[in-house]
UniProtKB/Swiss-Prot annotation:
This is Olfactory receptor 5p57. PROSITE patterns: G_PROTEIN_RECEP_F1_1, G_PROTEIN_RECEP_F1_2. Probable odorant receptor, which recognizes only aliphatic alcohols, suggesting that it may convey a 'woody' or 'sweet' sour. The chain crosses the membrane at residues 26-46, 55-75, 100-120, 134-154, 197-217, 238-258, 272-292. Belongs to the G-protein coupled receptor 1 family. GO terms for molecular function: G protein-coupled receptor activity; olfactory receptor activity. The gene is Or5p57. Disulfide bonds join C97-C189. It holds the Pfam family 7tm_4.
Length: 312
């Protein structure tokens, strides 16, 4: 492209989910409620785990960090999406767009590593219960949590580095409700295929590794459960894994669709729907999944409510 034949883009316009005013109002109210439930649910999980001695175990340490990541994940996307419902087109500078992408990828990738760590925790608890206190010591737990965050930011910097090297010299309207990498790539006038391949390889590798760890952990867990003679023991083991398996299926099913499958295999509208699910809906569902199906969490909640009521 000849110099001077294009205008350098300095800001983008997020088109959002819909142009219809009535639909926008309905979606604004709906997602405001979803975001409020997300914040309250995840904050409640964090406070509950921090204030309940019976929940001071590795599993609930991971769960508290999962709640923190869900708050960050949702908060990096939902507020700007809500603003988009109130005004036609949301303006965002290029630097702000790249920053949002970086934060979204960091929180999302950290969550995948954390879910793998939680699967390993369940494997040790069920398959080697006598060694649990040594194999899941505080040092090991801190290392697993720290590695999850580190892995998230490394992947985020890969996406950030590629996006900073993209050139934007034409349309600046992003047909999305946040700055995701795929819509940015479609607007770019750069023709370097590596900018599409490198993030896909990075995300794909992380998904393969984390899913492999989760799958291998649950294969061993299943074998151990089938060897149990006690029906009550089997039910208890299954119940501790059901919530995590549900969260894993929802999370990895959606991010695989977006970050691994070729862009030509899905439309922009499909991208939007799936993106809403994994950035807005799943962070709301996780605390509900872990609360309703977990006796220890429900008991800790009852004690906290009773204590609060007594002090009042």
């Amino acid at each position: 492209m000849e110099p001077g034949n294009y205008t350098v883009v300095t800001e983008f316009i997020l088109l959002g989910l819909t142009d219809d005013i009535t639909v926008s109002v309905i979606l604004f109210v709906m997602f405001l409620i979803v975001y409020s439930v997300t914040l309250m649910g995840n904050l409640n999980i964090i406070v509950l785990i921090r204030t309940s001695p019976q929940l001071h175990t590795p599993m609930y340490l991971f769960l508290s960090h999962l709640a923190f990541l869900d708050i960050g994940y949702s908060s990096s996307v939902t507020p700007i999406m809500l603003r988009g419902f109130l005004r036609k087109g949301t303006f965002i500078p290029v630097a702000g767009c790249v920053a949002q992408l970086c934060i979204v990828v960091a929180f999302g990738t950290s969550e995948s590593f954390l879910l793998a760590s939680m699967a390993y925790d369940r494997y040790v608890a069920i398959c080697s219960p006598l060694l649990y206190s040594t194999q899941m010591s505080s040092t090991v737990c801190i290392l697993l949590v720290g590695t999850s965050y580190l892995g998230g930011w490394v992947n985020a910097w890969i996406f950030t580095g590629c996006s900073l090297n993209l050139s934007f010299c034409g349309p600046n309207k992003i047909n999305h409700f946040f700055c995701d990498y795929s819509p940015l790539l479609k607007l770019s006038c750069s023709h370097d295929f590596s900018f599409e391949v490198i993030p896909a390889i990075s995300s794909g590798s992380i998904i393969v590794v984390t899913v492999f760890i989760i799958a291998l952990s649950y294969v061993y867990i299943l074998v151990s459960i089938l060897k149990m003679r006690s029906t009550e023991g089997r039910q208890k083991a299954f119940s501790t894994c059901t919530s995590h398996l549900t969260a894993v299926t929802l999370f990895f099913g959606t991010i695989t669709f977006i970050y691994v499958m070729p862009q030509s295999s899905y439309s922009t509208d499909q991208n939007k729907v799936v993106s809403v699910f994994y950035t807005v809906v799943i962070p709301m569902l996780n605390p509900l999944i872990y609360s309703f199906r977990n006796k220890e969490v429900k008991e800790a909640m009852k004690k906290l409510i009773a204590k609060t009521h007594w002090w009042s």
